[in-house]
């Protein structure tokens, strides 16, 4: 015999009545993939990259029909005929407003030091750094912004971790934290 008893907890605007419960807020963000002239690059196993694996079915006899696309930013020169040019769209990093004031200058200096490497690749001022305003209308978790976050931990890991999200078809970095 099948029975379907009525629920005994009809809910509340104050959350669940069970003291073992926790409220969790979840947000899903969707973005449209860019339509541009970005050219994917395949991994060279001699160099370490973050990669996205894609299946390549164009060679039927290939025992390993997959390729690894490297994750990289889509930097395009404003002036392609110049040796060094500013990019059309620079990589903009935001220092989260919760970062202690005494560390912000050093963090900004460290990030901007990457411009030296980008100059070797032909880009001037490829990386910019801004500080999230205290009254920002956007959250540090907003995927439209590349945010350097400050976290405190009793057991801090060595260094940092920089997750990014990419176009799965090309490996183009669309954003990062």
Regions flagged by a language model, labelled:
Residues 1-99, 108, 117, 121, ...:
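Auxiliary tRNA-acceptor-end handling modules of aminoacyl-tRNA synthetases
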Residues 105-109, 113:
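Extended non-catalytic domains of envelope/secretory-pathway proteins
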Residues 127:
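Conserved structured catalytic cores and adjacent interaction surfaces
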């Amino acid at each position: 015999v099948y029975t379907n008893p009525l629920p005994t907890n009809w809910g509340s605007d104050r959350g669940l009545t069970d003291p073992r419960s926790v409220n969790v807020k979840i947000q899903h963000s969707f973005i449209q993939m860019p339509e541009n002239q970005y050219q994917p690059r395949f991994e060279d196993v001699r160099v370490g990259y973050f990669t996205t694996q894609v299946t390549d079915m164009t060679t039927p006899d290939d025992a390993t029909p997959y390729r690894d696309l490297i994750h990289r930013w889509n930097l395009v020169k404003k002036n392609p005929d110049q040796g060094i040019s500013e990019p059309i769209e620079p990589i903009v990093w935001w220092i989260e407003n919760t970062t202690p004031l005494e560390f912000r200058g050093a963090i900004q200096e460290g990030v901007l030091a990457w411009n030296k490497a980008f100059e070797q690749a032909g880009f001037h001022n490829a990386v910019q750094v801004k500080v999230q305003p205290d009254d920002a209308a956007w959250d540090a978790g907003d995927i439209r912004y590349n945010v350097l976050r400050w976290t405190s931990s009793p057991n801090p890991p060595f260094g940092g971790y920089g997750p990014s999200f990419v176009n799965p078809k090309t490996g183009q970095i669309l954003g990062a934290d």
